[in-house]
């Protein structure tokens, strides 16, 4: 905000804001809120504005597009913005023949899948969204938890605060799975979030030890698939 304020103090507002007339008189600012705030801080009493008669849906889309590219935008802000724009575009009806998620993503240079995940994230409670903003809860974990009921989300928030635990993707995946089946209880949430995370075991196979089993015609992917296939067969035979 300091950079914006200083720029306005030196050069003024270079890009006009966008507003629309209010039914009861006056104007509603649609885009340019940061420029307005920067102007006030810089001691300016006026800023350039373009006035258009936009519908509610058009105003929502313009507002989202003007804010979504901010470098400092929080995950919660982006989630709510994408949801607002998606709903506004759906309300308008399809005009281009494209998927609405694709259209939302194109304007923000993100793919439809990422946009969908942000929209799911918007279903989190305000408390959990704040945890995502402050990186106390990961984005992917937040998306998983967004599938839970409001009550179950409250359980998750309380236990995270109580235990100070970091939720892994494995744990959030379990919460989502049990939540979908309707089997999730407070006790189960507590058990899942407080269970000791198993240490990931890494095994490295040296090339000189396995090269004698494969000719040069095999690619690395083919070798990996064969090894996995043999291990699956070994497990099925009761070796593990």
Give residue spans per PLM region:
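Short, charged/polar connector segments at secondary-structure boundaries
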Residues: 1-52, 63-69
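EF-Ts-like protein-protein interaction surfaces
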Residues: 123-126, 136-195
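Helical mechanochemical/support elements of P-loop NTPase systems and associated helical scaffolds
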Residues: 4, 34-35, 60, 75-78, ...
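Short acidic DE-rich linear segments
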Residues: 229-240
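Signal for well-folded cores of large energy- and translation-related assemblies
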Residues: 9, 13, 90, 120-123, ...
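Alpha-helical interaction elements
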Residues: 69-150, 155
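Charged/polar low-complexity intrinsically disordered segments, enriched in acidic residues
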Residues: 174-230
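Positively charged, structured surface patches that bind polyanionic biopolymers
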Residues: 54-58
């Amino acid at each position: 905000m300091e950079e914006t304020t200083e720029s306005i103090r030196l050069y003024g507002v270079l890009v006009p804001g966008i507003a629309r007339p209010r039914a009861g008189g006056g104007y509603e600012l649609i885009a340019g809120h940061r420029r307005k705030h920067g102007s006030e801080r810089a001691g300016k009493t006026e800023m350039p504005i373009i006035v258009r008669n936009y519908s509610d849906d058009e105003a929502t889309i313009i507002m989202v597009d003007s804010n979504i590219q901010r470098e400092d935008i929080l995950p919660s802000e982006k989630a709510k913005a994408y949801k607002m724009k998606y709903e506004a575009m759906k309300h308008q009806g399809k005009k281009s023949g494209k998927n609405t998620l694709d259209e939302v993503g194109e304007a923000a240079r993100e793919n439809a899948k990422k946009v969908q995940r942000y929209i799911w994230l918007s279903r989190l409670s305000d408390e959990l969204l704040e945890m995502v903003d402050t990186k106390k809860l990961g984005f992917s974990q937040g998306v998983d938890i967004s599938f839970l009921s409001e009550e179950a989300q409250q359980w998750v928030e309380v236990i995270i605060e109580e235990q100070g635990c970091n939720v892994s993707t494995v744990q959030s995946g379990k919460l989502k799975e049990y939540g979908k089946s309707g089997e999730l209880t407070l006790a189960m949430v507590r058990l899942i979030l407080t269970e000791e995370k198993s240490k990931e075991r890494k095994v490295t196979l040296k090339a000189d030890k396995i090269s004698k089993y494969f000719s040069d015609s095999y690619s690395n992917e083919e070798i990996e698939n064969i090894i996995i296939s043999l291990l699956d067969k070994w497990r099925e035979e009761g070796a593990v």
